[in-house]
Amino acid sequence: MNPLCSEFTSSSRKAPEAAIGQVLIEALPYIRKFEGKTFVIKYGGSAMKDELLKNSFAQNVTLLRKVGINVVLVHGGGDAITRTAEKLGLVSQFVHGKRVTDNDMITVVQMTLAGKVNQDIVRLLSEHGGKAVGVTGLDADTIKAVPGPNAEKLGLVGDVESINTDYIDLLCRAGLIPVIAPVGYDHNGNIYNINADDAASSIAIALKAEKLIYVSDVEGIQVGERILKTICKAEAADFIEQGIISGGMIPKVLSAFKTLDGGVRKIHLIDGKFTHSLLLEIFTHEGIGTQFIAEQDNDQQENR
Ligand SMILES: Nc1ncnc2c1ncn2[C@@H]1O[C@H](COP(=O)(O)OP(=O)(O)O)[C@@H](O)[C@H]1O
Ligand SMILES: CC(=O)N[C@@H](CCC(=O)OP(=O)(O)O)C(=O)O
């Protein structure tokens, strides 16, 4: 008989311990599979705001790093930018989920994302024993940008031109957790506001990451009452067209498919409002959230 089963039946006192052991051991094949691999995590939503969720996220990330996974965090902070802008008398406007960014707004973006939000995350990870390093797109050419396609409406919103993977790899090899703020600059020294989902996508592709995981505030992609377990490109285009996918979910979904096309194998959207959702996603047999797949009914539908 399986020794774990006999423990369950012979001593009820030991049953809870055995159950915990069973949960922990379920992680072993995944730890073996992912050791030395790179995960890019887009950190956003409540998991960046609520104290309990922030701490649980930081513990999860630290644990992933400690078991040998190269974790690269790319953070958002759209709400924080909006609040800082308001205090300075600037009104935020969005076009298809992207912030209209003039000269004043780019200053607010830079000081909020790179100055405050980034450093708060670094401190949080450090508190939990994760050795994190704050990186903005400007450090060591981490994110070189070009003006985005809708520049006449959006202003200084950039697209990623290139990523300095050597620098990010160097940090990972040193056992550090790069925490990247999504601002970039171009050859003329102009600074650009880059949507964090787009930045995460480009970084995941450039690093040839094993996974890109979006941590957001939703259980997954919602259609009516249903949360989709998988979504393919054609469905997503229809849902955007019909307004079923809207606002900040549009850049997330578009960047997810760009990442899939760019060769990253697994892309997940998980709920940051759910404590330890990251660990559950990676280390248990049951996947959660929505997985992005190229086409419906192909073999990519298996979990992780
Ligand atoms: N079909 C949909 N399914 C889930 N969320 C959606 C959908 N359409 C629009 N949304 C909205 O998109 C938001 C996520 O985008 P955003 O706020 O930019 O996330 P984050 O700040 O985590 O990057 C959700 O909070 C939700 O209100
Ligand atoms: C161009 C653009 O819209 N940039 C975003 C950058 C931050 C971000 O993406 O934050 P979330 O992930 O929290 O939405 C912004 O200014 O809000």
From Swiss-Prot:
Substrate binds at G77, G78, R99, N193. GO terms for cellular component: cytoplasm. One of its GO terms (biological process) is arginine biosynthetic process via ornithine. Its EC number is 2.7.2.8. Belongs to the acetylglutamate kinase family. ArgB subfamily. It comes from the Bacteria. Keywords: Amino-acid biosynthesis, Arginine biosynthesis, ATP-binding, Cytoplasm, Kinase, Nucleotide-binding, Transferase. This is Acetylglutamate kinase. It catalyses: N-acetyl-L-glutamate + ATP = N-acetyl-L-glutamyl 5-phosphate + ADP. The record marks K42, K252 as: Transition state stabilizer. The keyword ATP-binding applies. It is found in: Cytoplasm. Catalyzes the ATP-dependent phosphorylation of N-acetyl-L-glutamate. Pathway: Amino-acid biosynthesis; L-arginine biosynthesis; N(2)-acetyl-L-ornithine from L-glutamate: step 2/4. The gene is argB. InterPro entries: AceGlu_kinase-like_sf (IPR036393), AcgluKinase_fam (IPR004662), ArgB (IPR037528), Asp/Glu/Uridylate_kinase (IPR001048), NAGK-C (IPR041727). GO terms for molecular function: acetylglutamate kinase activity; ATP binding.
